Curated annotation (Swiss-Prot):
It comes from Rickettsia bellii (strain RML369-C). Belongs to the SecA family. It is a peripheral membrane protein. Its EC number is 7.4.2.8. Keywords: ATP-binding, Cell inner membrane, Cell membrane, Cytoplasm, Membrane, Metal-binding, Nucleotide-binding, Protein transport, Translocase, Translocation, Transport, Zinc. This is Protein translocase subunit SecA. Its cofactor is Zn(2+). SUPFAM superfamilies: Helical scaffold and wing domains of SecA, P-loop containing nucleoside triphosphate hydrolases, Pre-protein crosslinking domain of SecA. GO terms for cellular component: cell envelope Sec protein transport complex; cytosol; plasma membrane. Part of the Sec protein translocase complex. Interacts with the SecYEG preprotein conducting channel. Has a central role in coupling the hydrolysis of ATP to the transfer of proteins into and across the cell membrane, serving both as a receptor for the preprotein-SecB complex and as an ATP-driven molecular motor driving the stepwise translocation of polypeptide chains across the membrane. It catalyses: ATP + H2O + cellular proteinSide 1 = ADP + phosphate + cellular proteinSide 2. The gene is secA.
């Protein structure tokens, strides 16, 4: 019934496309007039559009003409005229939606249309992609079109200076990776002046490979972190003990990816820990004093039993490097959190890096939701359309191809074992190779790609391997995968963003020529030779059937399978795709084994035989849908929790910006002084209480600790004195202390000093707050056992922690302001600035990367704004000797190593 209605009325997507074609007719009607313009007149259209916008026109008012201008500029610069379907893709992007366009349909060129149009508003446009290679390539190639029309183009890649980044972000259109954008946002919110920031306010972003960024990478946060206590020795000891455990000592659930000790396992671990003198004899793993060890044991168990080398990570240059499960690429600089990375380093016997404490973090989900207008493009988005709508409020429009797809997607073949599957794959590759048909073999991990490579080596079939170990050659290898007799093994979707052209990519082959060693004539001859060779090979490859894509197993996500299929059949080229499966494959074994095994037993599968059955295909699709649904729920749940932190982060970042912008910090100082003075006085002199109930001694101590005030005992001895009068005197005395500092150091110097103290204190308490939230998140799921909703509990406690953080901020800020002094012998007035470059230069960022310790970075202000009681470098403190600790902040972890805050440990009686 539903299918009949679809045939009559069409799908919602069909109706959207039909409406868009009427818009395209309007753009096409402008083309003859635009073509008659000279180059200079075409460039002046940009100036004309900007004037219209300033006079009240909207982007939609000029959209059709702007698109026609870009199309003509592209034709003149590159000889490439946007197809009608590319104009549709551009309109979809301009209207803040996601466009699904097949591989080879020219998404890079499509982005020029909305990028140019939206850049006319002079608020900046970000074109986002997944790696530095694509950023450099696309900004250089498409930049010629923008430059022709008088717009500037910037390019952001790793390793650039702040000055270079600022210039790039101030361009009309900026190409950047998602990682660099996210880290620049976090870094900007750790800067000490607006002039030092590199980003402009958020405006419009176009995300290439949008599914990879907004879905595949949504669970991993961007993190700027700093080192905490060194526990590398303990990770090493626990790792040795975990290696001695038996299979019966733990239970693992591959579906949920969890692992837990059994009762016998706990006893075994306790025995091993006792023998190693890590815990006392006869004490238990879950005894209070040993609870911290549970974390180390659990992470070591996960490292040894849930994470595999060359599948989840690899070891390169003595470092454990994470492999992206969706792309097969190495995730440079990223580290697993919560000690898992250290456990993997212990497992692989490489140097164990310190654990990190989060200083700033954000997920891509929340970063990209900062843009008032967001759009994206990819070859595969329809399967994830509900999630993109639900989380990002982005609709997906599938744009028809310019040429009809002639690729044939063949039925899956299912075998009883991996060996039988590999034999069948080998047979097909041999057949294709003998006929000259290029083959792309897609695998789900480095381990699998190397297994296939070994099979081909044994059978003397030449081939290229593309996986995380050969990331540098990625674009070139994948671009030449369509050559005659080429056999390429690729991990998942490595090489996305680079087209596979039948016969080879002549441009990339030309780039390999050593031009310096050739004369101009010889170079031209070589170029013509390459072009002729690739053209001839293209004819041979088409005759052989085009690119044959072989999938070695189904991925957890149907979208990834579709991406692999989409490698073949670009722009109407011929091609074939086929998946080979076995009962040993992870997806089959974990999610669909019982059902499918029953079918195979019924059908009587014999060794070496393949089977095709609709029920098996349906079971596989259901298994994939089940996993997709599970992963979606994880991402959705992550967002619910992250939204709590995101709301708090927005408040802190907005406050931080206001502090930096403020011309006078005295108002905040004055109001906070008044608030704390009232609070302290009422604590020790409660309103309406009797004089004998007043705690004058501790009031004096607290006022001196907070405001550096010595309380006049004669004042308190007056019979008629009230708490209001004492409060008033405290406020006046504190104000006079501040005014005397202004006279001694100058108002400007004091203003900058107070502002700096406020910013550094805010950064410190925010860092501690993030640490507290991390701990809260780790254990909050256990509240479900008490019939409580973990999310509601997290929201409630996170709010309480946030209030506590704000109170700490006020106390620490006031204490520092009233106690510090400036050594004018070592500082000039012009040295008091908030730029603090040394601090910024010591920042490092990662997806859990070792970073910096803020108070070790050093700056003019840090060395010369000395508190009355100096602070000792934490590394120089002896845990057993409190006299070596110097001044310890009440909210710092106690130097004794107890894990408690100082005010609840050795500072309890201060």
């Amino acid at each position: 019934m539903f299918s009949i209605l679809k045939k009559i009325f069409g799908t919602a997507n069909d109706r959207t496309i039909k409406k868009l074609f009427s818009d395209i007719a309007k753009i096409n009607s402008l083309e003859p007039a635009i073509q008659k313009l000279s180059d200079e007149e075409l460039k002046n259209k940009t100036v004309e559009f900007k004037k219209k916008l300033k006079n009240g026109a909207t982007l939609d008012d000029i959209a059709y003409e702007a698109f026609a201008v870009v199309r003509e500029a592209s034709r003149r610069v590159y000889g490439m005229r946007h197809f009608d379907v590319q104009l549709i893709g551009g309109l979809v992007l301009h209207r803040g939606m996601i466009t699904e366009m097949r591989t080879g349909e020219g998404k890079t060129l499509v982005a020029t249309l909305p990028a140019y149009l939206n850049a006319l508003a002079e608020k900046g446009v970000h074109v986002v992609t997944v790696n530095d290679y694509l950023v450099s390539r696309d900004s250089a190639s498409m930049g010629k079109i923008y430059n022709f029309l008088g717009l500037s183009v910037g390019c952001i890649v790793a390793g650039m200076t702040d000055e270079a980044k600022r210039e790039a972000y101030n361009s009309d259109i900026t190409y950047a990776t998602n990682n660099e954008l996210g880290f620049d946002y976090l870094r900007d919110n750790m800067k000490y002046s607006l002039q030092e920031r590199v980003l402009r306010p958020f405006n419009f972003a176009i995300i290439d490979e949008v599914d990879s960024i907004l879905i595949d990478e949504a669970r991993t946060p961007l993190v700027i972190s700093g080192p905490v206590n060194d526990n590398s020795e303990l990770y090493g000891k626990v790792d040795k003990l975990v290696r001695m455990l038996n299979v019966s000592d733990f239970e693992k659930d591959e579906k949920l990816k969890t692992i837990n000790l059994t009762e016998s396992g706990i006893s075994h671990v306790e025995s091993l820990l006792s023998q190693a003198d890590i815990i006392k004899p006869n004490s238990g793993l879950y005894d209070f004093e040993n609870l911290s060890l549970v974390h180390y044991v659990n992470q070591a168990l996960r490292a040894h039993n849930m994470f595999m080398i060359d599948v989840d990570y690899l070891v390169r240059d003595g470092k454990v490097m994470i492999i992206d499960e969706f792309t097969g690429r190495v995730m440079e600089g990223r580290r697993y959190s919560e000690g898992l990375h250290q456990a993997l380093e212990a497992k692989e016997n490489v140097k164990i890096q310190n654990e990190n404490q989060t200083l700033a973090s954000i997920t891509f989900q929340n970063y990209f939701r900062n843009y008032p207008k967001l759009s994206g493009m990819t070859g595969t988005a329809m399967t994830e359309a509900p999630e993109l709508k639900d989380i990002y409020n982005l609709d997906v429009v599938a744009v028809p191809t310019h040429n009809k797809v002639t690729r044939r997607d063949l039925d899956d073949e299912i075998y009883g074992s991996k060996k039988e599957k590999y034999d069948a794959i080998l047979k097909l590759i041999k057949d294709c190779y003998d006929r000259g048909q290029p083959v792309l073999v897609g695998t789900v991990s480095i381990e699998k790609s190397e297994e296939i490579s070994n099979v081909l080596n044994k059978n003397k079939i030449p081939h290229k391997v593309l996986n995380a170990k050969f990331h540098e050659q990625e674009a070139f290898i994948i671009a030449q995968a369509g050559r005659f007799k080429a056999v390429t093994i690729a991990t998942n979707m490595a090489g996305r963003g680079t087209d596979i052209m039948l016969g080879g990519n002549p441009e990339m082959l030309i780039e390999q020529i050593d031009r310096k060693s050739l004369t101009n004539a010889a170079y031209k001859e070589k170029v013509n030779e390459i072009k002729a060779q690739t053209a001839e090979e293209k004819k041979q490859v088409i005759a052989a059937g085009g690119l044959f894509v072989i999938g070695t197993e189904r991925h957890e996500s149907r979208r990834i399978d579709n991406q692999l299929r989409g490698r073949s059949g670009r722009q109407g080229d011929p091609g074939n795709t086929k998946f080979f499966l076995s009962l040993d494959d992870d997806l089959m074994r974990i999610f669909a084994s019982e059902r499918i095994s029953g079918v195979l037993r019924t059908l009587g599968l014999k060794d070496g035989e393949a089977i095709h059955h609709p029920m098996i295909s349906r079971s596989l699709e259901k298994a994939q849908q089940k996993v997709e649904g599970h992963n979606y729920e994880i991402r959705k749940n992550l967002l619910r929790f992250d939204d709590v932190m995101n709301d708090q982060r927005k408040i802190i970042y907005e406050q931080r910006t206001e502090i930096i912008k403020s011309k006078d910090s005295y108002d905040f100082l004055s109001s906070t002084t008044e608030e704390l003075a009232k609070k302290i006085v009422l604590t020790f002199m409660p309103a309406g209480s009797y004089r004998e109930d007043w705690d004058i001694e501790n009031l004096s101590v607290e006022l001196h600790r907070t405001f550096a005030i010595k309380l006049d005992q004669n004042l308190i001895s007056k019979n008629d004195v009230t708490e209001e009068e004492v409060t008033k005197i405290v406020i006046q005395t504190a104000d006079s202390i501040y005014k005397s500092k202004e006279e001694a150091y100058s108002p400007d110097l004091m203003h900058n000093a107070v502002k700096y103290i406020l910013l550094t204190t805010l950064d410190q308490v925010w860092k501690d707050h993030l640490h507290s939230l991390d701990h809260l998140r780790q254990g909050i799921s256990l509240r479900a056992y008490a019939q409580k909703d973990p999310l509601s509990e997290y929201k409630r406690e996170a709010f309480n922690l946030f209030e506590h953080m704000l109170n700490n901020l006020k106390e620490l800020f006031i204490q520092t302001v009233y106690h510090f002094h400036i050594d004018l012998k070592h500082i000039q007035k012009e040295d008091i600035s908030l730029e603090n470059k040394k601090l910024q230069n010591n920042m490092h960022e990662s997806r859990e990367d070792p970073a910096f310790s803020k108070y070790n970075a050093g700056s003019n202000l840090e060395t010369d704004l000395r508190p009355v009681i100096s602070r000792i470098n934490p590394e120089d403190r002896d845990p057993k000797n409190p006299t070596s600790w110097g001044k310890v902040s009440r909210n710092e972890l106690c130097p004794c190593g107890s894990g408690k805050k100082y005010k609840y440990c050795h500072g309890l009686n201060e």
